[in-house]
């Protein structure tokens, strides 16, 4: 970096201000001005400083040619000198001595004395326009910092003006739009990529264009003008810079290993991370999102998700990234809040041209791509916004407009009718899918009711299947009951009842629906939704249970076939059967633990529990139960987090107590802690107060072991019951309070997720009716085959036309070329016209920018306005004084001329 600092050979001469300056009020505090301008604190502050030359770069720096290393070494040496000289010389040793002319020039630039600045720039030949004060600021920086537009314009006309980039950054940070326009008009910004390169990159290329002083830049070296404007939310400045071609480059992926990222990471990892955050701050700024993107809503949603991921990756900057992610989400909500009609709401929620048209005209459903994306990225305030909810509610009651205004009793009656008449409705839909009945059944609300009714019937079958055992069973585990003497007992126990057959049909129907959903969404999107994982797990367990039951039935049937073909006696108790056949005649108490029927019954019980837990899936549809279901889900997450610490403590005490008492098997009051299994049981049930204190007592007089057992058992109970369980209760209470504080948003977000699962085409008929293909499915299948064959024919025809193209005449080619040119021009004219979605988005962004500007004006501090008025008055004062001096001179000349005419004789004598 060029320092522009020369070594002082002799003290500069002190020059007092001229009398005219005293008349103008500049003599006030002249001595303090000289001290402020870089005069050393010696002899009353009248001795000029003698700055030292900058340190010469070492051989390493010269060999590598790295200005940043040279600057780092120079700053290190300067820091040592300042530490030696003390804080009184913090700034005194940096700037060169100023002449009286330069000091007057800097004062005039700082206080907006336009006449003096203009006069000195036009008349003085010795003036250095790049002279700096004790803080290292030149006249341009002082004028911009005090918002003197006229002075800035005068200075920008001078050639070889330094630090124009820093003046631009200063004007942007203070929001001086007119000064920014003036600076951007300077020829210095005509250079290629002047606005896109960061100050650090610019410094490595040529000069100190963005430098504040010889020590570096005013802001972070990676801050470009447009990044700074975006940070400060200056909409007008961002617009100006975008028109000049400035853009914010999106940082590379965090795990990017390109040469550029690797080099930056190696040189300074902290600066690299800060530069990424500064870039993301600019990208996430509402000003930049509004003015730079063709689809600000989509850009903000994707950027919020990217920032949320970075918050989990870069833990050290977690709060910064989360704040930026929330800023993007608030921007999307702010744009949605400015919608004034359904067309604008539909445009934002759908995000394409087709959805921007009224739905009734086209007769197709909205895609709701932006809503799905917001749900995926958990932009809850956007989904729960009244404008979005009103549109979703309209789609929810599609083709059922009258039902929306009905009471809850009427809606419950509709649900009951649908549940009872579900088979007949399914038959009607199979016969006439495009009739009025078919349209009603395709309504999202009716699909939800049909699926809910089908699942309730499924749960009813599960209950009814166990109803014969509600009051107990007559057949004890050690008793066998058969229908005839030669019957194998297991044949009777493994037979499927009609309710179990219906349950199997329902399970197959639900499995078919899950497979179709998995095919349409893909494995990754399918697994993301936990309810899908629960459904798939539940159905898999059901299938495993029925498979094990079927295997047991096959084995029992084979045994029965053996008896029927080989045994002639009528009573099996009098016959000696092979062991593999005899086993199937035993009562339940003699079955093996690995028996397929026992495994089937255990899996079936687990599947039933999961089936009833799936009722929570439909609870968000109700305003009363929805928040409770959300709190329950959050509680389950807290329990899983708690289990990590719980298992660690539990295993430590379980192994320790087992090691302590494993040698005393049979020598204790009870078998607690003598085996790993007993240790687990004792410690687990002690959490609920169901274990005895005598679990650590020995029959022998080994008090040392017994006392250690008492101590460990007591510490375990205090740790688990008093500390960890209360910690879990506090976590659950905190999670519930978070849901309760924002219950409306959480509930509407969960309800919207439920609604969207029924908005897409398909899933009209619930299981098990979905197993039977409708005639509409065959029609769609035939249409797909037809379209595929047509596309193939078109490809063949196109290939033939391309092959025959060489045999065409020149006249035909000329005609075709003209027609193609005309078509291309017309097509381009169509492309240049903004789409309906772009027009709507333009209106919304314009409202957003206007609202942001109004809010900013209302939030501005009065001190800033008073300072601006004070500076304007100061500039006006100098102009009035200049006008006064000019008027005085003109009056003196006029009086002199009059005196010459009136007294010619006196003049001759003189």
UniProtKB/Swiss-Prot annotation:
Q: Which domain of life is it from?
A: Eukaryota
Q: Which InterPro entries match?
A: Ankyrin_rpt, Ankyrin_rpt-contain_sf, Ion_trans_dom, TRP_dom, TRPC3_channel, TRPC_channel
Q: In which tissues is it expressed?
A: Abundantly expressed in brain. Concentrated in cerebellar Purkinje cells and sparsely localized in cerebellar granule lyer, pontine nuclei and thalamus. Lower levels detected in other tissues.
Repeats (ANK): which ranges? 100-129, 135-164, 166-192, 221-250, 623-652
Q: Which residues bind Ca(2+) 3?
A: 860, 863, 865
Q: How does the record classify its membrane topology?
A: Multi-pass membrane protein
Q: Which GO terms describe its molecular function?
A: calcium-activated cation channel activity; inositol 1,4,5 trisphosphate binding; metal ion binding; store-operated calcium channel activity
* Residues reported to bind Ca(2+) 2: 514, 517, 532
Mark out the compositionally biased spans (Low complexity): 59-68
**Region annotated Disordered, chain positions:** 1-93
Against SMART domains, the record matches this protein to: ANK, TRP_2
What positions does the record give for glycosylation? 478
| PROSITE patterns with a match to the protein in the record | ANK_REP_REGION
One of the GO BP terms on file: positive regulation of cardiac muscle hypertrophy in response to stress
Q: Which NCBIfam families match?
A: trp
Name the PANTHER family on file.
Answer: SHORT TRANSIENT RECEPTOR POTENTIAL CHANNEL 3, TRANSIENT RECEPTOR POTENTIAL CHANNEL
Subunit composition and interactions? Homotetramer. Interacts with ITPR1, ITPR3, MX1 and RNF24. Interacts with JPH2; the interaction is involved in maintaining Ca(2+) homeostasis in skeletal muscle and is mediated by JPH2 'Ser-165' phosphorylation.
Q: What is this protein called?
A: Short transient receptor potential channel 3
Q: Which species is listed as the source? A: Mus musculus
């Amino acid at each position: 970096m060029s320092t522009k600092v020369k070594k002082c050979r002799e003290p500069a001469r002190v020059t007092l201000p001229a009398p005219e300056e005293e008349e103008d009020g500049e003599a006030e505090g002249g001595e303090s001005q000289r001290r402020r301008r870089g005069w050393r604190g010696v002899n009353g502050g009248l001795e000029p400083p003698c700055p030292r030359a900058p340190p010469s770069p070492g051989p390493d720096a010269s060999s590598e040619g790295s200005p940043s290393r040279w600057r780092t070494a120079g700053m290190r040496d300067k820091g040592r000198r300042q530490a030696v000289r003390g804080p009184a010389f913090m700034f005194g040793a940096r700037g060169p001595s100023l002449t009286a002319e330069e000091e007057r020039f800097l004062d005039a630039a700082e206080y907006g004395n336009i006449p003096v600045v203009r006069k000195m720039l036009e008349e003085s030949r010795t003036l250095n326009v790049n002279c700096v004060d004790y803080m290292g600021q030149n006249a341009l920086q002082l004028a911009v910092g005090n918002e003197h537009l006229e002075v800035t314009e005068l200075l920008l006309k001078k050639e070889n003006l330094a630090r124009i980039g820093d003046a631009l950054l200063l004007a942007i940070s203070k929001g001086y739009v007119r000064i920014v326009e003036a600076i951007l008009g300077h020829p210095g910004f005509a250079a290629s990529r002047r606005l896109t390169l960061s100050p650090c990159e610019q410094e490595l290329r040529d000069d100190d264009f963005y430098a504040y002083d010889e020590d570096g830049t005013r802001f972070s070296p990676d801050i470009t003008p447009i990044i700074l404007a975006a940070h400060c939310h200056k909409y007008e400045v961002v617009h100006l810079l975008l028109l000049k071609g400035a853009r914010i480059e999106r940082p590379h992926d965090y795990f990017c290993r390109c040469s550029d990222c690797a080099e930056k990471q190696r040189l300074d990892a902290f600066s690299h991370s800060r530069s990424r955050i500064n870039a993301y701050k600019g990208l996430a700024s509402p000003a930049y999102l509004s003015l730079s993107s063709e689809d600000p809503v989509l850009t903000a949603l994707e950027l919020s998700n990217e920032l949320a991921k970075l918050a989990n990756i870069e833990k050290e900057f977690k709060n910064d990234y989360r704040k930026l992610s929330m800023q993007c989400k608030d921007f999307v909500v702010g744009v949605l809040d400015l919608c004034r009609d359904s067309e604008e709401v539909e445009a934002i929620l759908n995000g394409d041209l087709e959805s921007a048209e009224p739905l009734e005209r086209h007769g197709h459903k909205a895609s709701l791509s932006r809503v799905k994306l917001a749900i995926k990225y958990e932009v809850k305030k956007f989904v729960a916004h009244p404008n979005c909810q009103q549109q979703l509610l309209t789609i929810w009651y599609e083709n059922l407009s009258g039902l929306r205004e009905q009471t809850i009793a009427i809606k419950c009656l509709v649900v009951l009718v649908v549940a009872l008449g579900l088979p007949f409705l399914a038959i009607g839909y199979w016969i006439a899918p495009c009739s009025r009945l078919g349209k009603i059944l395709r309504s999202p609300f009716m699909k939800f009711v049909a699926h809910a009714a089908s699942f309730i019937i499924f749960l009813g079958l599960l209950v009814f299947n166990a109803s014969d055992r509600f009051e107990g069973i007559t057949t004890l585990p050690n008793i066998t009951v058969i229908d005839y003497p030669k019957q194998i007992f297991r044949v009777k126990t493994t037979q499927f009842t009609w309710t179990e057959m219906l349950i199997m049909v329902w399970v197959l129907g639900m499995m078919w629906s899950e497979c179709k959903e998995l095919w349409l969404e893909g494995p990754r999107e399918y697994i993301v939704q936990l309810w899908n994982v629960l459904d798939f797990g539940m159905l898999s367990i059901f299938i495993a249970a029925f498979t094990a039951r079927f295997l047991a039935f096959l084995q029992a049937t084979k045994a029965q076939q053996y008896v029927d073909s080989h045994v002639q006696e009528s009573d099996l108790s009098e016959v000696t059967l092979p062991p593999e056949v005899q086993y199937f005649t035993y009562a339940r108490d003699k079955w093996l633990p690995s028996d397929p029927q026992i495994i089937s019954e255990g899996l079936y019980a687990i599947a039933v529990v999961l089936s009833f837990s799936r009722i929570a899936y439909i609870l968000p549809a109700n305003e009363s139960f929805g928040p409770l279901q959300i709190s329950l889900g959050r509680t389950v997450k807290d329990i899983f987090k708690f289990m990590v610490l719980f298992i660690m403590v539990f295993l430590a005490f379980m192994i320790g107590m087992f090691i302590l008492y494993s040698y005393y098997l049979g020598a204790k009051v009870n078998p607690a802690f003598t085996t790993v299994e007993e240790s687990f049981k004792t410690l687990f049930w002690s959490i609920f107060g169901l274990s005895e204190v005598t679990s650590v007592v020995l029959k022998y007089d080994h008090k040392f072991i017994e006392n250690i057992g008492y101590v460990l058992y007591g510490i375990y109970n205090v740790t688990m019951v008093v500390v960890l369980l209360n910690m879990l209760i506090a976590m659950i209470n905190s999670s519930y309070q978070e849901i309760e504080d924002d219950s409306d948003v959480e509930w509407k977000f969960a309800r919207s997720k439920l609604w969207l699962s029924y908005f897409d085409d398909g899933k009209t008929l619930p299981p098990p009716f979905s197993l039977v293909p409708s005639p509409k499915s065959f029609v769609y299948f035939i249409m797909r085959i037809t379209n595929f064959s047509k596309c193939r024919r078109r490809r063949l025809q196109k290939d033939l036309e391309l092959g025959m193209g060489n045999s065409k005449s020149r006249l035909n080619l000329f005609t075709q070329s003209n027609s193609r040119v005309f078509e291309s021009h017309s097509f381009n004219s169509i492309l240049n016209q903004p789409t309906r979605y772009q027009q709507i988005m333009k209106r919304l962004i314009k409202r957003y920018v206007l609202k942001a500007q109004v809010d900013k004006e209302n939030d501005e501090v009065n001190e800033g306005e008073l300072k601006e008025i004070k500076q304007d008055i100061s500039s006006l004062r100098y102009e009035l004084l200049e006008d006064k001096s000019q008027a005085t001179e003109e009056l003196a000349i006029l009086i002199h001329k009059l005196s010459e005419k009136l007294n010619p004789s006196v003049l001759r004598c003189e």
